Amino acid sequence: ADASLPPVDALWLPGGYPELHGPALAANTAMREALRAFHADDKPILAECGGMLYLQDHLTELDGTTHAMMGLIPGDGIMRDRGGCQGMQTAPLPEGDIRGHAHHRTRTEDGPTPIAHGRRARHPAPGEPIVRDRRLTATYLHLFFGANPPAVARLFGATSI
């Protein structure tokens, strides 16, 4: 497991399956401290799905085993044995609308108040929550960067496009 971040100006945590690596993620204190320092330096971070789960307080597996995660985003990710929200949504971000999709097998409890919810194309119910803490943006949505490249550039800190 990596113990440090490379020299970068922004981070994208695109997901994966943190539930398969809970003990290793919890034990990697060097990387956890590096991510905390990156966030404290107010650099842009986009965390999607599993990346968002990694940044929450805890992740609980189906058998009830709970692992400490980063604690940068309040809340707990809890595995469930069936799929959650699925389908295309648009993320209405301050930087601009960006299309994406959701597919996950967790739910989040005790999370922060979202800045927005994804908009579903064919369903009136609110989509996935989108949370923000300074320059950290987190959501279950997997964003399609090609949908709005200028908005993505602004999300990652570009000042001119």
Give residue ranges: language-model regions.
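Generic recognition of flexible, low-complexity loop/linker segments
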Residues: 1, 34-35, 55, 126-128
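A general structural motif
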Residues: 1-5, 26-29
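Helical hairpin unit composed of two closely spaced alpha helices linked by a short loop
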Residues: 2, 8-13, 54
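Short coil/turn connectors at secondary-structure junctions
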Residues: 7-8, 41-43, 66-68, 97, ...
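Structural motif
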Residues: 12-14, 46, 138-140
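Cysteine-nucleophile active-site neighborhood
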Residues: 18-92
